[in-house]
Amino acid sequence: MYIIPAVDMKEGKCVQLIQGDPTKRHVEYDNPDEIAKMWIENGAEMLHLVDLDGAIDGERVNLPCVKKIIQESKVPVQMGGGIRTIQDVEELVDLGINKVIIGTVAVQNPDFVEQLAKKVGSDKIMVALDAKDGKVVIKGWKEKTEYTPVQMGKILEEKGAGSILFTNVDSEGLLNGINITPTKELVDNLNIPIIASGGVTTIEDLIEFKKIGVAGVVVGSALYKNNFKLQDAINTVNNFKI
């Protein structure tokens, strides 16, 4: 199981938001590429980049940071944030992004996933599923759909999604710990890899995710607030036998 540090970028800086709110930030650093390098030096085997400006305003102001991170890092990079068109996806794949994360547009139009999979290959397509109160939410968590994560996950898998990034919004960015059940339901019902995200506060949380069989866990706030050291987490999780 990969432990994947999040590098969230806003206006060229590395930030961590609380509950996705651009006005509420846990932390802020000037050089996202330096942060990415630090995580790799501390053992990260994969990075999770989020372009918050792309996600919030449709602007790609963080592209220079992204290019720098890709050039300097020798680990796979997955990236999301405001990716809405085939052109967006192709540009990022050409740039060297290993997995491009799409969200709302995939849930609203699963056929789009099929088009993308044909164009760049399923392995490059990761769909972000966000859930609140047991239902998938879209548009920056503002709009609730009628689908459960498993229902939507099955549709997306059928359409060619290569993996799912699942965020339980109820716990995201609050440092309250995790509710493992919705993630376990996805792992149990889908055949593609599930990457978990949201609410990790302790190494024990990571162990819980390993027990249910997720492929990786994205960790943000807990690392930036120094709840635990990345290297310690990697060692503990790798040594834990199920």
Curated annotation (Swiss-Prot):
One GO MF term attached to the UniProt entry: 1-(5-phosphoribosyl)-5-[(5-phosphoribosylamino)methylideneamino]imidazole-4-carboxamide isomerase activity
Protein's recorded name: 1-(5-phosphoribosyl)-5-[(5-phosphoribosylamino)methylideneamino] imidazole-4-carboxamide isomerase
Entry's EC annotation: 5.3.1.16
InterPro entries to which the protein is assigned, alphabetical: Aldolase_TIM, His_biosynth, HisA_bact_arch, Isoase_HisA-like, Isoase_HisA-like_bact, RibuloseP-bd_barrel
Subcellular localization(s) per the UniProt record: Cytoplasm
Source domain of life: Archaea
Catalytic activity reported: 1-(5-phospho-beta-D-ribosyl)-5-[(5-phospho-beta-D-ribosylamino)methylideneamino]imidazole-4-carboxamide = 5-[(5-phospho-1-deoxy-D-ribulos-1-ylimino)methylamino]-1-(5-phospho-beta-D-ribosyl)imidazole-4-carboxamide
Record's GO cellular component terms: cytoplasm
